[in-house]
Amino acid sequence: MYTLARQLLFKLSPETSHELSIDLIGAGGRLGLNRLLAPRPASLPVSVLGLEFPNPVGLAAGLDKNGDAIDGFGQLGFGFIEIGTVTPRPQPGNPKPRLFRLPQASAIINRMGFNNHGVDHLLARVRAAKYRGVLGINIGKNFDTPVERAVDDYLTCLDKVYADASYVTVNVSSPNTPGLRSLQFGDSLKQLLEALRQRQEDLALRHGRRVPLAIKIAPDMSDEETALVAAALVEAGMDAVIATNTTLGREGVEGLPHGDEAGGLSGAPVREKSTHTVKVLAGELGGRLPIIAAGGITEGAHAAEKIAAGASLVQIYSGFIYKGPALIREAVDAIAALPRRN
């Protein structure tokens, strides 16, 4: 069924197809039809971040930016869902066209630029949803907020989403917001993490529960830079790291139509780079922080590869676009077949 739907959707522009898919998945969720789209994955419970996941395969942020189809995605068998990236104020994102398919490489290039309806809209959608599984909310800064004041945007979003999130992801690694990736380094990272940690403690006292914080990083750092980030996360008391966001590299798409478009590359070509980052993090962290792996999972074996590299959970996005909900069960089955899970 999904193969036919994909053929029809791929006749549309990528962004139109994306918007229509969100509408259809949302409608299917309201009608309870999405459970029919693919066999449910086997139960493979895992406890991470003090949360109980029915399986370790989640939806990565970016697909449902505004939380418009939470119930729909919740019926597809994901072990958890991450929505966003959301910013304090609504913003249109970058000029179109800004989303490109590279089907020959099972890849996508995007330069969306955090287009979203703002945190208040997202929260209204979260509160209207019936989904009661693990829900991550991914937060970012507005385009027109200077990088030196980015912490204000992150704290604003954290304040607002805290009560409704199972965990919160801080996105400092999108390549499509100028200057954002500079927050991954040095004093900028240290100051951001310190502010987030202090606000997390304040909010935990206010709300009577501690919501974990995850930091999402890029795949384009050197091993030394990744090691420094890992040390900073441990020192600041962060709860998890998501590895990785999209890459600025173009290995694997050279010469393909749209292969030279500006933006972040996701899908199969980023897989090895992302998995390498997971391995470096695992070596540096030594189990002190769980790793959520994302990047290039287009087959079940790729999800198992991430777990074997040291991740506790995985997320899919581009692979879901190309393979549909069947990839969820395929990934869960492949992870279940590992001789030992981390």
UniProtKB/Swiss-Prot annotation:
Keyword Membrane: yes
UniProt keyword terms in alphabetical order: Cell membrane, Flavoprotein, FMN, Membrane, Oxidoreductase, Pyrimidine biosynthesis
Subcellular location(s) of the protein: Cell membrane
Coiled coil ranges: none
GO terms for biological process, alphabetical: 'de novo' pyrimidine nucleobase biosynthetic process; 'de novo' UMP biosynthetic process
Principal location: membrane
Residues that, per the record, bind substrate: 65, 110-114, 171, 176, 245-246
Amino-acid positions noted as binding FMN in the UniProt annotation, renumbered to this chain: 61-65, 85, 138, 171, 216, 244, 267, 296, 317-318
Function: Catalyzes the conversion of dihydroorotate to orotate with quinone as electron acceptor.
HAMAP family, per the entry: DHO_dh_type2
Protein name: Dihydroorotate dehydrogenase (quinone)
Taxon lineage: Bacteria, Pseudomonadati, Pseudomonadota, Gammaproteobacteria, Pseudomonadales
